[in-house]
Amino acid sequence: MSENYSDSDSSCGWTVINHEGSDIETVTSENGSSNDNHEFVSEEYVSLQEVEQPIELQAQDSTDGEIPVVDNTLSALEETQTVPEERKEKVHDDSSCIGTISDDSDIVTLEAPKGEETPSQEEAPADGEEAPSSEDFNMGSSSSSQYAFSQPETVFPSQASDDESSSDETSNQSSPTVRRRRAKRRLISCSEAESGSPVGPEPEPPQEQQHKRQFSSGLNRCIILALVIAISMGFGHFYGTIQIQKRQQLLTKTRELKDDLYQCQQEQGDKVGSLKGDLATCLTSTEVEKKSFESQKKSLAAENQHLRESLEKEEKALVSLQEELRKLRQQIRNLEDKGTSTESIVMENQKLREHLEEEKQRNHNFRRQKETLFAEAQMLRRELDKERHVTEALKKELEQLSSRQTPDSVNDDDTLRENEEIETLRGRLVELEKKLNFEQQRSDLWEKLYVEAKDLTEKQEMNEKGQKRGAKGQSKSKKKSKESFFGSVKETFDVMKNSAKEFVRHHKEKIKQAKEAVKEKLKKFSDSVKSTFRHFKDTTKTILDEKEKKPNEKKYEANKKARTFYREHNLYENLKQSHYRRPNVPKDFRDGRRHHFTAFEKDTDSQKCLNDPLCSRKHQFDLKGCSGIFECANQEFVSLFNRVSDPIGVDEFNRLMRKYLQQVVHNFRHWRELENFINKFFHNGFFIHDQMLFTDFVNDVKDYLEDMKEYQNKNEKVFDDLDKYIYRYYFQYDNSPQYGPSRPKRPSFTQTENPRHEKQAQKYHHRNKREGKWHKHGRTNGRHMANLEIELGQLPFDPKY
């Protein structure tokens, strides 16, 4: 920052200290006689240095902080510091040594000596080189008068570079350090001409020396005055620079504060925006919550109103109940006052309830018996229809047989005999039809009587219920009166008791009459049917035997064709309908009957089904009068075993069969075959009670086991108690149900009348053994010949008979 200038043109002994902010110039005269002036100058110099030291420290502190300077201050400082070159040239041209002080800067300009004393510029550097070489520096010697330039002391540190000064000059921006540019002028001493003179000058006169001394003393005084002025101005300048630095520091601080404030404002703006968004969301949420709260408030208010209304209603009901309770207590007190106890009333009520339960049970039993009677009547009617169809079929068969006979194929005697037999058969058939019609009329009459009796019983029940209600109303009205309370209770009890007794007695008589009438009718009907069909069976048997003995080849071939066709038809139907069972006929009678009617059934039924396509539909009867598995099972078990039970399940029946066979037979090896056979009679896990009786199914299972060869050879009666075992398990019933008073034993095949019947029975025994009892609509199993003999024994609706 500081610069040292030494000019060879100046011959006076000057010491110029160029400092920023002030220029301290010391001028020594040539004569050097005045030591006081020298000491004064040195003291001033030392004091100036002491003053400048703290200023330098402050400048160093300010430069360490790198304070920016405003462009306006720099431009002002440069204007004050720069000195135009024209002044410098004027200084060189001036010949006077009068000191001048410029207003622009604190620079002292001294007037130069005369022009002839001014040395040339070439000699000045030589003299300048000699000056530092002299050890004894004498300010008063005129011969050695010269400028001596000392190194100026810098107030600011040397950290600032020339690049910064050049950049500050060219740019308007603030620089980190304050720089002052001082104008360097050549100070021309008065003794330039003398210093430029040769080494050995001529001695001057004393007047000139005195004049020079006076001039040098005045010059020293001017220099001292200029120094004092410069020091004062420098001190003021230093003080001004410090204030400028402080202002610059304040400016930097204010700028930093402005930046911080701007950043804070931006951050606060962002925060305010986020807070505004949060407030908006909070407002919307609060509005939603407010609406929900209002809706909840309304709902709660409505619910509260509803609860209040319900509470008021309950309070009213409670008040009414309390009033009623008070009245009842008052009545109890009144009754206790009369001397009666509540225990007797409770006992009477209990007895009345028990009696009512008994009457209800009796009524229920009576209704069940009535239903069973009605079902039996329907069964009888269906049996009659069945027998009528059978007689019609027999009539058709006889007509066909009579039409087939030709006079050419037989002898006259045979034809006459056959015609007579046919006529007799026709007559008997006519008689049988008449009897059947008569029995039909009787059954219709009995059914009408039964319906009338049923209507009468229903009317009586309605009347008795009305009487009971009237008695109850009378008892209630009498209970209200305090005096006749117990009398009314007794009267109602007696009325109910008497009415129940009369009702039971009347219905018992009706039931007895109905049972006796049914018994008589069934006996008469069974006797008449048995006699007619037994006689008809014998006659047909003799006719068939005689026909087979005749040597008629055509007739034999026709019968053979009919047999083969019937056999094929039966095999196909048995394969197709293997899970349907045979009719409900006792097994022994069925086997015995098969020996007598096998051939006749084959001949007649095959021809009948050929001529009549609706033959299968004529024999599809629902003999039970029930619908559904549960209803049929209940009806069957109640009628046969007098027990109510659910339908039989396949899993339970299989477990029962396994248990029985493990007890009876060791190592039974036909489990799978037996299960397949049993599963044919079960649908969806239950027995088909609506298609077949369970007792027939048990008999069929028993027959299936008895027909196994390995158990047939050893002992025929291995599975004889199977039915009892099953009935005991399901119904706690030891005896198997009987369908007639006498169940004929199974006749052996050796007891047949002739070997032909034995062969036919053996031939068709296995095929017709497992034909179903009940048939679905639209199905047939090949057995078109119904059982012609009806055996009636125990009535199924009451186990007493």
Curated annotation (Swiss-Prot):
Organism: Gallus gallus (Chicken)
Subcellular location as annotated: Cytoplasmic granule membrane
Lumenal membrane side: 243-801
Compositionally biased region (Acidic residues): 124-133
GO biological process, one term: positive regulation of cell cycle
Stated name of the protein: Cell cycle progression protein 1
Compositionally biased spans, kind Basic and acidic residues: 84-95
Cellular component, GO annotation: membrane
Keywords: Cell cycle, Coiled coil, Membrane, Signal-anchor, Transmembrane, Transmembrane helix
Segments crossing the lipid bilayer: 222-242
Disordered, as annotated region: 79-214, 397-417, 460-483, 736-780
Record keyword Cell cycle present: yes
Coiled-coil region list: 285-449, 500-530, 695-726
Family: Belongs to the CCPG1 family.
Biased composition (Low complexity): 168-177
Taxonomic path: Eukaryota, Metazoa, Chordata, Craniata, Vertebrata
